[in-house]
């Protein structure tokens, strides 16, 4: 067998794409514009994302506890029902080879595979595949049928299992029903009830690729090569059938989902061990996607006018590929066939580029999905050949030819990671099949020591305030530790005290030199307390407690007596428990709460403030009170005076709002400092304050100004302190899944 490159580089492709999507026209946005405030004033911060997933859209009620309901679930019975579904073929969408396994593997993969590591968005953790745009992406064609097949199971178990869990559990069950041993599974995903507003790219047509610049540089944080795809175009970049060029796209997009080369190769080879793609006829005979389909189709899309439209006549992608002779069984035949032939280009019945063995080799060795008397020729996608023709992937996959047990192990681990990457630490996982924590789950030690009680907390607060650290230092350090959290994939946060480890201790926003000195003092307090015997305090708890004590002291300085809630139980992670590369993506490009903006950032700071607030699960009132309070506490990056509109810093006052709304101050862009504004006395012109756009937006944006007016009022001093304390505690506890 020759290893020469079998690629034709001069072909043109039809407008088909990913392994399961039809080449149908994109939906055209219509409407009478301008029709919203955003249309009139597109540069205003969009605060609507901070109102998303309101309880008003959730039918389950405020008291619904998914974990409690799940505890009532017979998971073994659920598993039996899902596995039974695999071979219960339905006439309205017949199962290929009498088994829906390949379809459900694809459904689960595409539910989880939208995850992107750059901002943690996407993934299967909320059941978003049920809603637009994901339910109508060309890459998700025919997955509406998979979800409808699952409906009787969901209907039977009701609120005891979420759609989010079921959509990914089905793929796990599919693998096991086809003889594969999975690595494990964790439930615990809670459903959303409205679409997620996520930036999926700049294009306004399906399969557009305006996201590239220069030498095929993919814009961040996007994780797919074209609009409406999960990863890559299986025909090759922009439909050009070049496996080597496709490998570059594969490597980039899978890396943006936190997968390395071994994991990537395992997922592609493992996933394509099962099932088939569908391109029995011309793609222009396929109707509109679910969101564009007529009401009588009841949310089902892509209705085909080719033959019966289903079974042997099904069109989903325009590609007609069956990879192995055993498409409902786990084995090593995908790799055996990939390396067993030399390959040449051909086209599917729909006109899509795909590959067959040269010189008619292998003809009749692949079974037909609906006619047991017929045989087919082996077929591959351009992106399958990438696993052989890319030198790195070739080294990995060729070894698996002789070591199938290694392939199975790597696929099991990669599949588990794919399904769970956006779920956060294992403390969020439910069910009996959760394996030991993996490094990518950011593990922390269990809390085995006796926890500090109220008396210990009082002693530690006193020692922290007497340690020589200022209110500002204690607040800033606690905020830096906790505010690394992002709600999109439940990573970061104060638990683990990773602020003292690589890479966080060297992030610019954390002011490494100052941070190091503060941590040394906190470690001294910790050591002195722990050496006394009895309860032990972790550095993670002490960092948060320092901020808590400082907030209480600052409120006292303002004449307000408040108690800031504190719950011990955090533990300290080690450097060995911390994947440095994985944590690098958590470094903030901006943190408006600390008035930090990374050099060279092009997106306005006030827009990035909203994104940071979204990551911290904050509402507009919480954002407002936190910014105002942190300015009063002098918690700015670099201790700049921007936005510190007070002559009594480190005192928890509402001075930020009072002075921001004072019409005696006139604001002008600074002539000496970028992204800074000078506030001068309107009557005399004397300088009064400096500010950033993050500060001034609380006076310029009408919604934020309305909130600022509440806190600037004469009767708001106590409310301001109490609201700040509540919002502060919320941020400190965002990653306390053990108690929340």
Curated annotation (Swiss-Prot):
The entry's heme b-binding residues are: 272
Q: Where is this cross-link: Tryptophyl-tyrosyl-methioninium (Tyr-Met) (with W-109)?
A: 231-257
What's the domain of life for this entry? Bacteria
Which Pfam families does the UniProt entry name for this protein? peroxidase
Q: Which reaction does it catalyse?
A: H2O2 + AH2 = A + 2 H2O; 2 H2O2 = O2 + 2 H2O
**Posttranslational modification, per the record?**
Formation of the three residue Trp-Tyr-Met cross-link is important for the catalase, but not the peroxidase activity of the enzyme.
| Record cross-link Tryptophyl-tyrosyl-methioninium (Trp-Tyr) (with M-257), residues | 109-231
Does Oxidoreductase show up as a keyword for this record?
yes
Q: Which CDD domains match?
A: catalase_peroxidase_1, catalase_peroxidase_2
- EC code(s) of this entry: 1.11.1.21
Q: Give the Gene Ontology MF terms in alphabetical order.
A: catalase activity; heme binding; metal ion binding
Q: What class of enzyme is it?
A: oxidoreductase
Cofactor: record remark: Binds 1 heme b (iron(II)-protoporphyrin IX) group per dimer.
Q: Where is the signal peptide?
A: none
Q: Which residues form the active site?
A: 110
Residues the record marks as site: Transition state stabilizer:
106
Per the entry, what this protein does is: Bifunctional enzyme with both catalase and broad-spectrum peroxidase activity.
Quaternary structure and partners: Homodimer or homotetramer.
Q: What is this protein called?
A: Catalase-peroxidase
- Source organism of this protein record: Rhodococcus erythropolis (strain PR4 / NBRC 100887)
């Amino acid at each position: 067998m020759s290893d020469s490159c079998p690629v034709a580089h001069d072909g043109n492709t039809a407008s088909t794409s990913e392994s399961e999507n039809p080449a149908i026209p994109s939906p055209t946005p219509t409407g009478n514009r301008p029709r919203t405030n955003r249309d009139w004033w597109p540069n205003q911060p969009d605060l609507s994302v901070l109102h998303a997933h309101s309880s008003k859209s959730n039918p389950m009620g405020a008291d619904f506890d998914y974990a409690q309901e799940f505890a009532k679930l017979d998971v073994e019975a659920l598993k039996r029902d899902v596995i039974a579904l695999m071979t219960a073929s339905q006439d309205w969408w017949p199962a290929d080879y009498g088994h829906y396994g390949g379809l459900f593997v694809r459904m689960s993969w595409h539910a989880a595979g939208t995850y992107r590591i750059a901002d943690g968005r996407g993934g299967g953790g909320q059941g978003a595949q049920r809603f637009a745009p994901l339910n109508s992406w060309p890459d998700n064609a025919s997955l509406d049928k998979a979800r409808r097949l699952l409906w009787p199971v969901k209907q039977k178990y009701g609120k005891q299992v979420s759609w989010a869990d079921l959509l990914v559990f089905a793929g796990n069950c599919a693998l096991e029903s086809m003889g594969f041993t999975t690595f494990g599974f964790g439930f615990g995903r809670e459903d959303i009830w409205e679409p997620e507003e996520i930036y999926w790219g700049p294009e306004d047509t399906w399969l557009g690729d305006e996201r590239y610049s220069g030498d095929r540089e993919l814009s961040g944080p996007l994780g797919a090569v074209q609009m409406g795809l999960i990863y890559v175009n299986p025909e090759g970049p922009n439909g050009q059938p070049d496996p080597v060029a496709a490998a570059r796209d594969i490597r980039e997009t899978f890396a943006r989902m936190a997968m390395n080369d071994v994991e990537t190769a395992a997922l592609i080879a493992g996933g394509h061990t099962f099932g088939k793609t569908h391109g029995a006829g011309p793609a222009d005979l396929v109707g509109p996607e679910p969101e564009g389909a007529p009401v009588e189709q009841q949310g089902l899309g892509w209705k085909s006018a080719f033959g019966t439209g289903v079974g042997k006549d099904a069109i989903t992608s325009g590609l007609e590929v069956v990879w192995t002779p055993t498409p409902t069984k786990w084995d090593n035949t995908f790799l055996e066939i990939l390396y067993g032939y030399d390959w040449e280009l051909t086209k599917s019945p729909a006109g899509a580029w795909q590959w067959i063995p040269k010189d008619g080799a292998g003809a009749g060795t692949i079974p037909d999905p609906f006619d047991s008397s017929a045989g087919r020729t082996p077929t591959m996608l351009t992106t399958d050949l990438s696993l052989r023709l890319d030198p790195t992937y070739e080294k990995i996959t060729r070894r698996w030819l002789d070591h199938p047990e290694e392939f199975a192990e790597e696929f099991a681990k990669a599949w588990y990671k794919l399904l769970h990457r956006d779920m956060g630490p294992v403390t969020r996982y439910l069910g009996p099949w959760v394996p030991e924590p993996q490094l990518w789950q950011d593990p922390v030690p269990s809390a085995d020591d006796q926890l500090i009680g109220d008396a210990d907390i009082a002693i530690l607060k006193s020692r922290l305030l007497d340690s020589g650290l200022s209110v500002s230092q204690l607040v800033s350090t606690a905020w830096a530790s906790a505010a690394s959290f992002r709600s999109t994939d439940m990573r970061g946060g104060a638990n683990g005290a990773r602020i003292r480890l690589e890479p966080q201790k060297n992030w610019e926003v954390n002011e490494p030199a100052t941070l190091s000195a503060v941590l040394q003092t906190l470690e001294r307090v910790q050591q002195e307390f722990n050496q006394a015997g009895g309860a032990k305090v972790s550095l993670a708890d002490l960092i948060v407690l320092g901020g808590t004590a400082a907030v209480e002291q600052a409120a006292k300085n303002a004449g307000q007596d408040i108690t800031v809630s504190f719950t011990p139980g955090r533990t300290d992670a080690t450097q060995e428990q911390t994947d440095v590369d994985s944590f690098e993506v958590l470094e903030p490009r901006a943190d408006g709460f600390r008035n930090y903006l990374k050099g060279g950032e092009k997106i306005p700071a006030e827009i990035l403030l909203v994104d940071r607030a979204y990551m911290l699960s904050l509402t507009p009132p919480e954002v407002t009170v936190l910014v105002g309070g942190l300015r009063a506490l002098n918690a700015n990056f670099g201790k700049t005076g921007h936005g510190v509109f007070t002559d009594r810093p480190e005192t928890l006052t509402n001075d930020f709002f009072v002075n921001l709304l004072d019409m005696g101050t006139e604001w002008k862009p600074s002539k000496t400092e970028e992204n800074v504004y000078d506030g001068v006395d309107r009557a005399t012109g004397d300088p009064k304050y400096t500010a950033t756009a993050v500060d001034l937006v609380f006076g310029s944006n009408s919604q934020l100004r309305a909130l600022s007016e509440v806190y600037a009022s004469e009767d708001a001093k106590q409310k301001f302190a109490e609201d700040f304390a509540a919002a502060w505690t919320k941020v400190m506890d965002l990653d306390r899944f053990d108690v929340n």
